[in-house]
Swiss-Prot record:
Annotated InterPro entries: DUF2179, DUF5698, UPF0316
Cellular location(s): Cell membrane
CDD domains: YitT_C_like_1
Residue ranges of the TM segments: 1-21, 35-55, 62-82
Record organism: Enterococcus faecalis (strain ATCC 700802 / V583)
Family statement: Belongs to the UPF0316 family.
Protein's name in the database: UPF0316 protein EF_1609
Database matches in PANTHER family: UPF0316 PROTEIN YEBE
GO cellular component: plasma membrane
Keywords assigned by UniProt, alphabetized: Cell membrane, Membrane, Transmembrane, Transmembrane helix
Topology versus the membrane: Multi-pass membrane protein
């Protein structure tokens, strides 16, 4: 059995590119990017057909299939990293604080850092709690978690991605606040 390194490299690169695009396209679709997702899918399917035909025409070499699978796995990993880097969309973070009196400074500190914070009082098994609702661009997600944990390490944090946002804090003022923070 002759090993064609050029062919193996082409199979890997093609499937790597296909799966990376597939992962990104899927995430764009889930975020509602209705124009760019179909455009990415056109490139994705073209690359897919090319790579698949290369492997199917050379099934006599099991190494081709192995490299195809390796390109698939690496493509998923890289696609996820790219999506994390792009950090499309927003997150909604709910923060439950141990008490309302000790942590009164936390909402104001978060606001000073440019976050929109809605606070309310809730009652848990051990009494009164302060609950914060924070909407943030995903690009700021890790920074927000670090800030909350620095200010209150006992905070209980839950985050999720909202499907629809309308009105409230998220107006043109957000850009102004972000610009002020970064300068």
């Amino acid at each position: 059995m002759v090993v064609d390194l050029k062919m193996l490299a082409m199979i890997f690169i093609i499937n790597f590119a296909y799966i990376t695009l597939n992962t990104i396209r899927f995430m764009l679709t889930m975020k509602g990017y209705r124009v760019i997702a179909p455009l990415v899918s056109m490139a994705e399917i073209t690359i897919y057909v090319l790579g698949l035909s290369m492997v199917l025409n050379r099934l006599d070499n099991p190494l081709n299939l192995l490299v195809y699978a390796l390109g698939y796995a690496v493509g998923i990993s890289v696609g996820i990293k790219i999506e994390d880097y792009l950090a499309l969309g927003y997150i909604m973070v709910s923060v439950i604080l141990p008490s309302t009196t000790e942590q009164f400074h936390l909402p104001e500190t978060l606001r000073e850092h440019g976050y929109g914070v809605t606070q309310s009082v809730a009652y848990g098994r051990e009494g009164e709690r302060m609950v914060l609702e924070i909407l943030s661009p995903r690009k700021n997600e890790r920074t927000l978690y670090k800030l909350i944990n620095q200010l209150e390490p006992r905070a209980f944090i839950i985050s999720y991605e909202p499907k629809f946002i309308s009105g409230g804090f998220w107006t043109k003022k957000v850009r102004k606040r972000n610009d002020a923070i970064s300068h």
